Amino acid sequence: IPAIINRYPTKEENFYWFKVIATHQVAHIEFGSFRFKFDTQSNIFNDTRSMLEAKQFNTIRIEDDSVEPNTAAITESSITDMQRFFNIFEDRTLALDIFSIVEDGRLDTRVLSEYLGIKRAYISVQNDSMVDRPEIKSLPAKEALIEFLVRMTLQRSGDTIIPSQY
């Protein structure tokens, strides 16, 4: 959260923006964004995390002979469970982007339904965030997908133009 907020012309509007941002950050903790444990068994999908992590580590060892056998233990103890999870994806950045967007959308939905006192300001900040969004049709396919997901979580997908090539 920034030390100084000068996003809007009035002190009151800037304070509302601050409350929305602070509420969203607190929602990460309150609604469990960081409760994920890599080694906890999946109860919905086939659990392939450990297999994928081992496969990735073996690929790294084949490509780099200088990797020591104890590196896996050091890595596991020095990174968070979330980092460990995203490291198993071939396109880590895309996986992290999709997770962040969907998780932020989940949090926004919870905040809007459980904190009615901030709802008007929250929706206003969401609406304002649409002003500087890029045009989807001007983006490459992967970026267009990400932008579409952002708009969906801001509940603005209905008026979003999707190029036919995507």
Question: Which residue stretches match the model-derived regions?
Answer:
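Short, functionally important secondary-structure microenvironments
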Residues: 1-166
